[in-house]
Amino acid sequence: MLGLIVALWATPVTWGAAAATSATFLAISIPLAIIAALMSKMMNIQTSTIPKLKCFDEHVELKLADGTKKTISQIDLGDILEDGATVVSKMRLNADNVQMYNLHGIIVSGTHVVKYQGKWIKMAVHPAATKVPYAKPYIYCLNTTSKRLMINGLTFTDWDEIYEGTLSDILSLEIKNERIGLDIKIEKEENIHKHLETGFSGNTPIELENGKTVCICDVNVGDKLKNGDEVYGLVDVDVLGMNQIYRRRLGDLQYIYGGINLCFGVDPDLTLVITAERYNGNVTKLYHLLTNSGKVCVKNVEFYDYNSGVDLFL
């Protein structure tokens, strides 16, 4: 709970949620940051290093609203699918050691959730799914405004994998903060992208283990980051439909640009003052990473990876 409170206070969109579990920002944010940093060091708290990939083979076809079809690897941000949902983010992921299944010609990972006889189940336990050998390097997934993927008459969850109880939790979120004029109610699936989407501008610097620094848009699957984490997935995010892009100041005249819901932990030396302001410049696409630790370091500040945008609210 302590780590969650710190993470929620660390980004503007989650201050309302943080208020539900803590008294006031000025009274507790700095003490909590110090305590969280000390506890992390003493207890060696880590997130899971075993990602659960919910993805499809590159040749799985999706029907668009205009009746044409595209393979999932060819889908573009902004494409409108047959159910009227818009594609708002796209993932390409490492397929190493992922068990894939064939369900009526759809090649999909065993951890992906599909609706069967009115219930949501993992692909691995679907009675008609069969294991298949798989040697391709990458698998793919999407997020959509409906939070569903309709493929050949079957209904799958999208990457966020929220349904039933978890979907209700997200749709019931109310986020208010008078300091920056936030008064948000999620209520509808399409508002998840609008208010909770996360990502960095393409020129955000990422330090690699080999000493090189590259823009986040040039990071590759399998790259090792400065802290030793491995990138197992790349995420492209459509800015269209998002609530706002923010500019964040990290320390002395260091700026990064991204969505309102960038979630970060405690600064390692507790010396950086991180501020955020609305940015009206030309940012048309965001990028994020998926790592085996669930974290990404930018300019010596540790952020949570793409999954945090929704997961921190569940």
Question: How should each PLM-predicted stretch be described?
Answer:
Residues 1-45:
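Small-residue-rich hydrophobic membrane-insertion segments
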Residues 19, 23, 67-73, 134, ...:
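Extracytoplasmic/periplasmic, Sec-exported soluble proteins
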Residues 57-66, 81-172, 176, 183, ...:
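Long beta-strand-rich cores associated with HINT superfamily self-processing modules
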Residues 29-77, 154, 162-224:
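Protein maturation boundaries and topogenic segments
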